């Protein structure tokens, strides 16, 4: 998971508009391909390939409004998220839509993309796939794993996991596993045992 700084430098703030002005949640774009998403022939399956960024929320809302029959997302190569707050917003929408998320053969989800994957009410994967986790870092050298377990900076993720169907105990177990699995500068590819232990896939 990538953790973004809460504050930006003053000069950037002077030039910035509100999130709603810069990246509206919905624009009405009806294209089959928007950002990291592409609706396939038949309109029931959408591919996802790339990093989740701030604009991804708009792309997701637009493309699912234009193609409301999309029920499955096939993840290809998804390295993570550059905006964790946006990522959890999209994940909650995915969960509310009762979507199936599948990692394609030879594909992977890492970092924040694993959090996205967990939003699927049905979660499957093909062959030769990987799920990668690690700690986050706040930009000043502080790793999430180095903070006390009751630190409020953990709440974004813990609250998210509960909102997509985990009980609080499972949410805590998985989250702190990811923090201790690898530092933010590295990645831990989950073993088959870990994938089973943390219920990454649905039956």
What residue spans do the PLM features occupy?
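STAS-typified acidic loop motif
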Residues: 25-59
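Short, glycine-/small-residue-enriched flexible loop/hinge segments at domain edges that mediate gating
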Residues: 68-86, 100-106
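Glycine-rich beta-to-alpha active-site loop
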Residues: 95-138
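Sec/Tat-exported extracytoplasmic proteins
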Residues: 56, 64-68, 77, 94, ...
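Charged, glycine-interspersed solvent-exposed loop segments at helix/strand-loop junctions
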Residues: 72, 96, 140-203
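Soluble non-cytosolic domains of exported or imported proteins
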Residues: 51-58, 81-88, 107-111, 125, ...
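Bacterial Sec-dependent N-terminal signal peptides
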Residues: 3-6, 11-34
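Extracytoplasmic/secreted envelope proteins and their assembly/folding machinery
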Residues: 57-64, 87-91, 95, 114, ...
């Amino acid at each position: 998971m990538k953790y973004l700084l809460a504050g930006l430098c003053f000069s950037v703030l002077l030039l910035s508009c509100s999130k709603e002005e810069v990246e509206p949640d919905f624009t009405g774009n009806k294209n089959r391909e928007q950002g990291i998403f592409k609706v396939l022939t038949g309109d029931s399956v959408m591919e996802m390939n790339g990093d989740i960024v701030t604009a991804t929320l708009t792309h997701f809302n637009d493309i699912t409004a234009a193609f409301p029959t999309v029920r499955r997302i096939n993840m290809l190569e998804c390295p993570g998220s550059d905006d964790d707050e946006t990522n959890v917003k999209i994940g909650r929408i995915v969960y509310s839509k009762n979507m199936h998320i599948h990692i394609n053969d030879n594909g992977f989800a890492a970092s924040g993309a694993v959090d996205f994957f967990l939003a699927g009410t049905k979660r499957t994967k093909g062959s030769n796939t990987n799920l990668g986790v690690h700690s986050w870092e706040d930009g000043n050298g502080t790793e999430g794993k180095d903070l006390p377990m009751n630190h409020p900076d953990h709440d974004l993720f813990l609250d998210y996991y509960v909102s997509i169907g985990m009980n609080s105990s499972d949410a805590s177990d998985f989250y702190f596993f990811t923090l201790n699995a690898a530092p933010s500068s590295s990645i831990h590819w989950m073993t088959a045992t870990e994938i089973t232990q943390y219920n990454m896939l649905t039956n």
